[in-house]
C-alpha cells in the first residue's frame, strides 16, 4: 500500500504545480452521455456518470466484465473465470441494473449473490459503457439501487455519398480481430461487417472465444504460502471418483476453461432525417462453465463435489426501436422500443463418490416495451416515459443415477408451477437551466411490480404454502442542483430514492450456496428502499482534471440472508446433508457510504497521468434479533480499490504503464451469513494487493493495429474480495486488428 500512497502523493503534487502554472485555463469540451436515455451533456446531470469510450480499453479485454475491472471505476467479483459480477457503491447483482442498448438485462431470476450475465454481451462489438452511480430508479425503475451499467453496442453506419445519382451506391467496411493471451491460453477471433447506403445499413458481428485453464500468479505472500494452490482435482476412472494429485502444477486452476460464441445483427433504415427504424438481434451461448470455487471445496480433507458446473448460458434478444425527431406538438423527440429476450441457465452438481447427479434448469421469456418523449424548451427539458416488462419463468429439475441411468425427483431451484413477474411504470424527468450556470434536476416515477409464483410439488421440501404473490407500488424521485462554472469548476449535490421489489429468486429459491447451508423461500418479503445523498466537486482545465464524489445511502428493509426456521426447524435434511436453514429477510436498517477521488494531469506532450480511488463502507442492524442496535457488516461491500496509470502516445502509437490495486478486507468486516465467501479467503480475510501492468498499441497503417500487453508483470498471486478463483498470473497478450 506504500506504493499506492506514494503515487497518489506525487499525483497530487503534479496537480498543484500545474494549477499554479495554468494562468489562462479553459474548459474542455463537455461529454455527450445517455444517462437520461436521450443524448445530453454530462454537465446537465447531477449524479456521477463515468463514460468509457476508449476502444482499446473496451475491445482489448477478455470479456465485458474485465472492462470494468481494468477501468478501476467498478469492483468486479468472480466465482469462476467465465464470470464477473459488478459492484457499484456497495450494491451487487440484482441491486445493480444492467442495460444493453436501452433494454433491461435484469430478469426475474437475477440473484442477490454473484452474477455472470454481463459476459453475455460481446465486448468486441461494444461502442461504449456508461456507469451511473447511485439510485437511478426514476428513469430506470426497480433494481437500480447501486446504479446502472449501460452497455451500448456499435450502431450500423449509413454511407452518405456526394455523388449526384438517384440511386445511392453501397459501401462495405469491417474489421478482423485476433487476440491471444498465454495466461489462460486465450484465443479470440472476431469479425464485423457494415454494409450501407444512404438509407439502409446492415451490421453483423461474430466472435468466437476459447479460454483454457487459468494460470494464477506464483508470487505469494509469506504469511499465506499455500493460498489458492490447486493441490488436487477429481477424475472419474472405472466408474469411480478418485482424487488426482496436482502438486506438480498448483498454479493451474484446473477446470476453469470455457468457450463462448456471440452473434449480433443490426438493420437500420432511415427513410428521412426525422425517422429511424432499428432492428437489433443478439445471441450469446457458452459451453459448460465449471463453478471453480465449489470444485475446490473440501470437508475433512475430502472434496465435497466431483462435478459442479453451469450449463450453457444462453441469451437471445430481438429488439425493435423507432426514433422520431422534429415532431409537431409539445414533444419534439420520441423513442419506442419493443423487445423480447429468451434466457437459459442451468446448474449441474454431483457430490464426491456419489452416483446421483442433479440437473436444475431455468428458462425465462422476457417481454418489454418502453416509450420515451422529450420536450425542448428555451430554458428547460422535460422527459416523460412509460415502460412495461413481463417475465415468465419455468424451473425444472431431475436427478439421474449415472450408474443405473434411473431418474428421480429433486427440488427445483425456483417455484415449479406457473411463475411470472411484471414491472410497470410511468415517469418524468425535468431539467431546468437557471441563471448563473445553475441546472436543476427533478424527477418522479410511479412503479408497480407484481409477482405470482406457484409450487406444485410441495412434498420434497414440505412447503407450508403453495403460492407466493406480491403486488408492490412505490413512488421514487430525485432532486438535485449542478453548478458549471466558466473556469471549469463543477459542483453538484442531490438526493434520490431507489426501489427494488423482491423477485422470483428472492421469494422462491431453494438452494445451497455452500455445504451445510440451505436457503429457503420467504413469502413475506417486502420491497427494499434506498435514500441517497450525493455531493460531487470537480475542476477541469486544458491541463488537468480532479474531482471527488461523496455519497451516503440509507437502506430501508434491506434484504439480508440470515438464520430462519422452516416448519419451526432451524436445520433440515437437504440433498442428504443436515443443513442450517437461512432465508432472505428484511432487516431493520442499513447504511452504505463512501467516496471516490479521481483525476488526470498532462505532465508532458502526449503524456498523461490518471488515477482513481474508491472507498465504501456498509453495515446493518436489527434490534429484533440482537436485542440492541448492534452494527454488523453488510455483505457485498468491497475493500478500497482503484487504478493509477501513466500513458504516452498519439494516433500512431501509445503505451501505458498502470497499476490496479485493492486494499485489505479483514475477516471482521465480512458478513459471515451472506455472499462474502469467507471460505475462499485466508483466515485473516482477503489481503491487499497491487499489480503492475503494461499495454501498448501500434498502428503502422491506417487499416492495421497491433497490440502487446503484459498483465501482472510481477506474477503476483492475488484474489478479488468474495471471489473463489485467483486472478491470472503474468499474462502476455498479443492482438491484431485489420480494417477493410
State each model region's role.
Residues 30-58, 85:
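N-terminal periplasmic "start-of-domain" segments of outer-membrane beta-barrel proteins
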Residues 105-135, 139:
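Short acidic/polar hinge/loop motifs at secondary-structure boundaries
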Residues 184-210, 220-288, 314-316, 433-434, ...:
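Transmembrane beta-barrel wall of Gram-negative outer-membrane proteins
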Residues 254-260, 270-331, 342-364, 413, ...:
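Flexible loop and strand-edge segments within Gram-negative outer membrane beta-barrel domains
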Residues 342-346, 394, 399-406, 450-461, ...:
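Surface-exposed extracellular loop regions of Gram-negative outer-membrane beta-barrel proteins
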Residues 362, 366-372, 423-425, 520-526, ...:
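Outer membrane beta-barrel strand-and-loop segments of large Gram-negative receptors
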Residues 383-486, 512, 582, 624-629:
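Signature of Gram-negative outer-membrane beta-barrel scaffolds
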Residues 435-436, 440, 448-449, 552-554, ...:
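Gram-negative outer-membrane beta-barrel transporters
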Amino acid at each position: 500500500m506504500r506504493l499506492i500512497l506514494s503515487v497518489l502523493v506525487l499525483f497530487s503534487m503534479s496537480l498543484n504545480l500545474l494549477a499554479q502554472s495554468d494562468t489562462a485555463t479553459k474548459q474542455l469540451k463537455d461529454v455527450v452521455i445517455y444517462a437520461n436515455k436521450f443524448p445530453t451533456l454530462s454537465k446537465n446531470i447531477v449524479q456521477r456518470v463515468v463514460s468509457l469510450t476508449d476502444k482499446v480499453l473496451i475491445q482489448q479485454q477478455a470479456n465485458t466484465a474485465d472492462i470494468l475491472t481494468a477501468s478501476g471505476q467498478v469492483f468486479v467479483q468472480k466465482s469462476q473465470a467465465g464470470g464477473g459480477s459488478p459492484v457499484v457503491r456497495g450494491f451487487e447483482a440484482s441491486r445493480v441494473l444492467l442495460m444493453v442498448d436501452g433494454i433491461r438485462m435484469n430478469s426475474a431470476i437475477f440473484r442477490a449473490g454473484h452474477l455472470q450475465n454481463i459476459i453475455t454481451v460481446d465486448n468486441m462489438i461494444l461502442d461504449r459503457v456508461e456507469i451511473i452511480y447511485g439510485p437511478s430508479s426514476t428513469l430506470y425503475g426497480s433494481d437500480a439501487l447501486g446504479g446502472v451499467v449501460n452497455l451500448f453496442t456499435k450502431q450500423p453506419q449509413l454511407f452518405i455519398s456526394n455523388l449526384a445519382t438517384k440511386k445511392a451506391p453501397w459501401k462495405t467496411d469491417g474489421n478482423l480481430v485476433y487476440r491471444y493471451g498465454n495466461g489462460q491460453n486465450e484465443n479470440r477471433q472476431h469479425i464485423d461487417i457494415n454494409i450501407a447506403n444512404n438509407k439502409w445499413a446492415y451490421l453483423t458481428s461474430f466472435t468466437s472465444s476459447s479460454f483454457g485453464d487459468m494460470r494464477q500468479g506464483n508470487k505469494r505472500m509469506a504469511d499465506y504460502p499455500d493460498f489458492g494452490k490447486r493441490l488436487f482435482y477429481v477424475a472419474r476412472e472405472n466408474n469411480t471418483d478418485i482424487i488426482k494429485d496436482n502438486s506438480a502444477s498448483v498454479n493451474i486452476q484446473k477446470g476453469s476453461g470455457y468457450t463462448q460464441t456471440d452473434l449480433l445483427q443490426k438493420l437500420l433504415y432511415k427513410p428521412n432525417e426525422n425517422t429511424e427504424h432499428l432492428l437489433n438481434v443478439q445471441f450469446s451461448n457458452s459451453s459448460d462453465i465449471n463453478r471453480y470455487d465449489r470444485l475446490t471445496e473440501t470437508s475433512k480433507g475430502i472434496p465435497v463435489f466431483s462435478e459442479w458446473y453451469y450449463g450453457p448460458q444462453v441469451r437471445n434478444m430481438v429488439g425493435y426501436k423507432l426514433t422520431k425527431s422534429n415532431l409537431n406538438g409539445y414533444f419534439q423527440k420520441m423513442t419506442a422500443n419493443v423487445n423480447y429476450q429468451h434466457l437459459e441457465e442451468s446448474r449441474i452438481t454431483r457430490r464426491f463418490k456419489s452416483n446421483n447427479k442433479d440437473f436444475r434448469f431455468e428458462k425465462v421469456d422476457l417481454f418489454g416495451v418502453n416509450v420515451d418523449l422529450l420536450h425542448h424548451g428555451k430554458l428547460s427539458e422535460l422527459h416523460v416515459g412509460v415502460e412495461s416488462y413481463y417475465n415468465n419463468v419455468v424451473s425444472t429439475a431431475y436427478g439421474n443415477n449415472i450408474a443405473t441411468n434411473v431418474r428421480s425427483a429433486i427440488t427445483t431451484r425456483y417455484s415449479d408451477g406457473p411463475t411470472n413477474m411484471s414491472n410497470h411504470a410511468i415517469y418524468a424527468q425535468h431539467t431546468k437551466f437557471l441563471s448563473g450556470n445553475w441546472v436543476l434536476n427533478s424527477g418522479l416515477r410511479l412503479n408497480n411490480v407484481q409477482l405470482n409464483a406457484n409450487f406444485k410439488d410441495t412434498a420434497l421440501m414440505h412447503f407450508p404454502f403453495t403460492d407466493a404473490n406480491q403486488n408492490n407500488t412505490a413512488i421514487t424521485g430525485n432532486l438535485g442542483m449542478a453548478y458549471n462554472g466558466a473556469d471549469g469548476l463543477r459542483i453538484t449535490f442531490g438526493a434520490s430514492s431507489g426501489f427494488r421489489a423482491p423477485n422470483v429468486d428472492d421469494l422462491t429459491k431453494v438452494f445451497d450456496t455452500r455445504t451445510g447451508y440451505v436457503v429457503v423461500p420467504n413469502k413475506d418479503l417486502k420491497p427494499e428502499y434506498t435514500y441517497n445523498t450525493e455531493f460531487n466537486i470537480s475542476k477541469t482545465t486544458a491541463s488537468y482534471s480532479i474531482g471527488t464524489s461523496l455519497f451516503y445511502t440509507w437502506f430501508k428493509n434491506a434484504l439480508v440472508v440470515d438464520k430462519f426456521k422452516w416448519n419451526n426447524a432451524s436445520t433440515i435434511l437437504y440433498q442428504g446433508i443436515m443443513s442450517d436453514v437461512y432465508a432472505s429477510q428484511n432487516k431493520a436498517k442499513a447504511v452504505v457510504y463512501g467516496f471516490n477521488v479521481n483525476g488526470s494531469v498532462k505532465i508532458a506532450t502526449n503524456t498523461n497521468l490518471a488515477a482513481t480511488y474508491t472507498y465504501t463502507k456498509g453495515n446493518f442492524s436489527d434490534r429484533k434479533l440482537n436485542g440492541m442496535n448492534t452494527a454488523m457488516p453488510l455483505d457485498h461491500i468491497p475493500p478500497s480499490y482503484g487504478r493509477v496509470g501513466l500513458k504516452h502516445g498519439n494516433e500512431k502509437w501509445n503505451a501505458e504503464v498502470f497499476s490496479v490495486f485493492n486494499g485489505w478486507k479483514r475477516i471482521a468486516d465480512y458478513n459471515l451469513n451472506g455472499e462474502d465467501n469467507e471460505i475462499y479467503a485466508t483466515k485473516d480475510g482477503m489481503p491487499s494487493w497491487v499489480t503492475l501492468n503494461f499495454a501498448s498499441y501500434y498502428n503502422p497503417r491506417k487499416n492495421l493495429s497491433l497490440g502487446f500487453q503484459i498483465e501482472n508483470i510481477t506474477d503476483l498471486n492475488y484474489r478479488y474480495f468474495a471471489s473463489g478463483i485467483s486472478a491470472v498470473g503474468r499474462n502476455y497478450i498479443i492482438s491484431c486488428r485489420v480494417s477493410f
